């Protein structure tokens, strides 16, 4: 138990030192740098050219879906690398756990595929045509 606490203590000390170094560097730079605000410094920079149009561009939602799926599988790899390093010590139960984990993510990928979120060019939905209504009989033709 004492060894576990000392290992967490080491991690905490490294975390604390990292925060102190980052905060110290930030505060030192903030105190030493000159402050000369200028409207040119806040303008949009496009490779040395004057900006044309608005900097706000609408992106298609498909980019978001592809990026989200990429992040999900990237995180999966982050979880599977440590598992792969200790696979021999964990035994077959760990293999089953990893397969279940990967299977759940693959089910999500199949769901996104079947739903059509991975199709880049989607067919445009066709609007069904209304059937022609028969001409109504005039009141003089009714019995």
From Swiss-Prot:
Localization (cell): Cell inner membrane
Ranges annotated as spanning the membrane: 8-28, 63-83, 93-113
UniProt-recorded Gene Ontology molecular function terms: NADH dehydrogenase (ubiquinone) activity; NADH:ubiquinone reductase (non-electrogenic) activity; quinone binding
Mode of membrane association: Multi-pass membrane protein
Superkingdom of origin organism: Bacteria
Pfam family name, one: Oxidored_q4
Keyword annotations from UniProtKB, A to Z: Cell inner membrane, Cell membrane, Membrane, NAD, Quinone, Translocase, Transmembrane, Transmembrane helix, Transport
Enzyme Commission number(s) of this protein: 7.1.1.-
Catalysed reactions, semicolon-separated: a quinone + NADH + 5 H(+)(in) = a quinol + NAD(+) + 4 H(+)(out)
InterPro entries referenced in this protein's UniProt entry, alphabetically: NAD(P)H_OxRDtase_bac/plastid, NADH_UbQ/plastoQ_OxRdtase_su3, NDAH_ubi_oxred_su3_sf
GO cellular component annotations of the record: NADH dehydrogenase complex; plasma membrane
Function: NDH-1 shuttles electrons from NADH, via FMN and iron-sulfur (Fe-S) centers, to quinones in the respiratory chain. The immediate electron acceptor for the enzyme in this species is believed to be a menaquinone. Couples the redox reaction to proton translocation (for every two electrons transferred, four hydrogen ions are translocated across the cytoplasmic membrane), and thus conserves the redox energy in a proton gradient.
Complex formation: NDH-1 is composed of 14 different subunits. Subunits NuoA, H, J, K, L, M, N constitute the membrane sector of the complex.
Family: Belongs to the complex I subunit 3 family.
Name the UniProt record assigns to this protein: NADH-quinone oxidoreductase subunit A
Protein's organism: Chlorobium phaeovibrioides (strain DSM 265 / 1930)
Gene field: nuoA
